Amino acid sequence: MAAHPTVGVEEEFLLVDPDSGAPIARNRDVARHAADRGVDLQLELTSCQVETATGVASSMADVREQLTHLRSTVARAADDSGARLLAVAVPPTVPHEFPVTDNPRYHRIAERFGMLAREQGICGAHVHVAVPTREVAIRVSNRLRPWLPVLLALTANSAIYRNADSGYASWRRMLWARWPSAGPPPHFDSADEFDAMVRMLLQSGAMLDEGQVYWDVRPSADFPTIEVRVADVPATVADTVLFAAIVRATVMTLLGDERDGAGVPRISAHALDAAYWRSARDGLDGIAIDLAESHAPMPARDLLGVLVDRITPALRAVGDHDLVRDGLARLDDEGNGAMRQRAAWRRRGEIADVIDAVAEATLA
């Protein structure tokens, strides 16, 4: 493993009609045009979504460059396909149900999970951070659990849904939580315990296959990484880079705690669910729950500051401290995706204004 952990980022995007802003089933066309430009896309469960993936990166400058290239290339591919690319975690305006991608596995998922699958159409971002072993990934996952809600608040980008303010900064979180294998991971004492839980979910039918391990943190099935999946897809490249930098430094800090034998916080499922709900509702604009220390409510921005203070040595070690400091100052001035959506909505109550603001931020 490199001197500092490498990272990789995956982002999911929505494809919409350029005129109405409604989701449009063009993923295969967009993937074909993107491939002509040298970018391979992953097709998601619904045919109105695509996913990009960076290569392995050692610096946030590299992550930024790759994300910018991917977003601009896929936006052009979408335009060539008669669609518009949006970095938004739920569609601001939606059909009754989403068409499922024509793929045998996705058809099996739709058959088993019914409207859960057909109402999917949600977009997240996943950050992979290199770790020494799968066992270490699971132990770090246990230590990450208290911080997952505030990371959700940081990236919240799904306030407007079905032509209305949802009342949540991250409505995606509320939709995603309906899946039986989604949400915060349980505390696992070992990789064997993790594997036993996965087997139980498979045997019960709650998962079709191991690709449906949807927990917000998991050891990657394909790479020697821990994958942090809690985020709404951020509105801008800068927001995604900020999230990735904080995640890497948090993992580095928790790896150090693991080496030092520091205690692991035990958090009840109910406390974690309550903290998730509050962060999904308020985002950065309101209250979060401090699960690491007091278990008391505090302003979300203050709790994010507590996390950044905690990981500052790691941020300095990889040269990301100024990036994170400046990124948080920018969020104070401009807001995150959910706040920008609401600002656009409040101007006239017109969904077209939200779509335009999201599209502009996607390529900012």
Swiss-Prot record:
Q: Which GO terms describe its biological process?
A: modified amino acid biosynthetic process
Q: Which Pfam families match?
A: GCS2
Renumbered to this chain, the signal peptide range is none
Q: Which keywords accompany this UniProt record?
A: ATP-binding, Ligase, Nucleotide-binding
**EC numbers for this chain:** 6.3.2.2
Stored HAMAP family = Glu_cys_ligase_2 (MF_01609)
Q: What's this protein's family per the entry?
A: Belongs to the glutamate--cysteine ligase type 2 family. YbdK subfamily.
Q: What is this protein called?
A: Putative glutamate--cysteine ligase 2-2
